[in-house]
Amino acid sequence: MNIKNFFEKYNIKINDQQIYKEALTHNSYANERKLKYSYQRLEFLGDAILQMYVSKFLFFHYSKLGEGELTRLRSSTVREESLSRIAKDINLGQLIRLGHGELMTKGYEKQSILADIFEALTAAVYIDQNEDGLLIWLEQTLFKYMKDPTFINVTKDFKSELQELLQSEKRSDLKYIIENEEFFVNENKTLYTVSVNLDGQKFGVGKGYSKQEAEQNAASDCLSKLKKPLTN
């Protein structure tokens, strides 16, 4: 499927194909072909756009929630796991331009790449279609997901959930420790490995392309291992 046919499904008639090619071009592809562009600059813009429009959506659709809860929902919505799931649902992986190495390791299925591409493509739509086209795109992708009745339950804050569990048991010795930082040149990102330690013992491990994401995943792993409330 080409770019034009892909966007026809969303009633978007593209004007500048080049901006979409840029949004779908991974660093590995650009390096192999000595291109002067990849999706990274558009990813930067797309991240800011999603922060803004997700904030507006939450503000107007969840009028009873306070600032803290809105912030939690926004963070959960724009995190890698959520965006990559949407990218998979719309079959975005088939459009990504990857280098040979990334193709061999199925880079089109990697959460980090799928999330980045969704951000970059969102920026491309905004540049090419302005706000009207952007809203058409978001309504059929991200906002559709956010309108699901289970949305609030799905976007969990595992760190807060773990903290509440420990507080209920009057336990406070909780620490998140960065165990490893691995830099990936092709993606220009650092993969963090974080452990959750309770009373000096490791109870969970998580990875992510930000410290916050790694901590959330570590907390989730910890919660899954705590089959029953902690006791003194």
UniProtKB/Swiss-Prot annotation:
Its EC number is 3.1.26.3. Residues 3-130 form the RNase III domain. Pfam families: dsrm, Ribonucleas_3_3. Its main location: cytoplasm. Its cofactor is Mg(2+). Signal peptide: none annotated. SMART domains: DSRM, RIBOc. It catalyses: Endonucleolytic cleavage to 5'-phosphomonoester. The active site is at D47, E119. GO terms for cellular component: cytoplasm. Residues 157-228 form the DRBM domain. It is an enzyme of class 3 (hydrolase). CDD domains: DSRM_RNAse_III_family, RIBOc. Keywords: Cytoplasm, Endonuclease, Hydrolase, Magnesium, Metal-binding, mRNA processing, Nuclease, RNA-binding, rRNA processing, rRNA-binding, tRNA processing. GO terms for molecular function: metal ion binding; ribonuclease III activity; rRNA binding. GO terms for biological process: mRNA processing; rRNA processing; tRNA processing. It is found in: Cytoplasm. Mg(2+) binds at E43, D116, E119. Homodimer. Digests double-stranded RNA. Involved in the processing of primary rRNA transcript to yield the immediate precursors to the large and small rRNAs (23S and 16S). Processes some mRNAs, and tRNAs when they are encoded in the rRNA operon. Processes pre-crRNA and tracrRNA of type II CRISPR loci if present in the organism. Belongs to the ribonuclease III family. This is Ribonuclease 3.
